[in-house]
Amino acid sequence: SALTKASKTADVIITTGGMSVGDADYLPRLFEQLGGESAAIKVAMKPGKPLTVGRLGAAIFLGLPGNPVSVFTTFALIGARTLRRRAGFSDSLPIRIQARVNFSLKRRPGRVEFRPATIIGYAGPTPVLSVAESGFSARISTLASASGFAVFPPGLIELAPGDTCDFIPFSPLAARY
């Protein structure tokens, strides 16, 4: 199988989709049959599950979710840091800046949420954001127009226009601070 070959030649194996518990999710069974060691990581983030990390042979294994925005989010925030550490670079957290929102938001608390956001202007040096509507995880088009992630902490229930939130720009150039 491709996983067997990769486990003998690659430093890191990354897959997307097929890691959950449904009938079509075959990777956990295959991974076990090949002698891999893995753990489903319960991350309290949205989007971002299921996420599996482990080893297959000498390779680090990252099993990312299947929805496009979930894949991008978990790789950008977790996978890329793993690769940097594996390559011997120091670990660094993404740049976060304060931004204002131009929307209202009501949400259930409990998980940190990373929602694709677009800078639509500036209030002085502070970016003003618009965000993707809920249900965005399967729509890759939300990433095409996004400048970064609006970050909503686990305890946040409501935002009103003019409130602030953290913003993680995809490019430091987008921050313009």
Feature roles, as predicted:
Residues 1-33:
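N-terminal small/polar loop signature for handling phosphorylated ligands or for N-terminal nucleophile
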Residues 30-177:
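Flexible glycine/proline-rich
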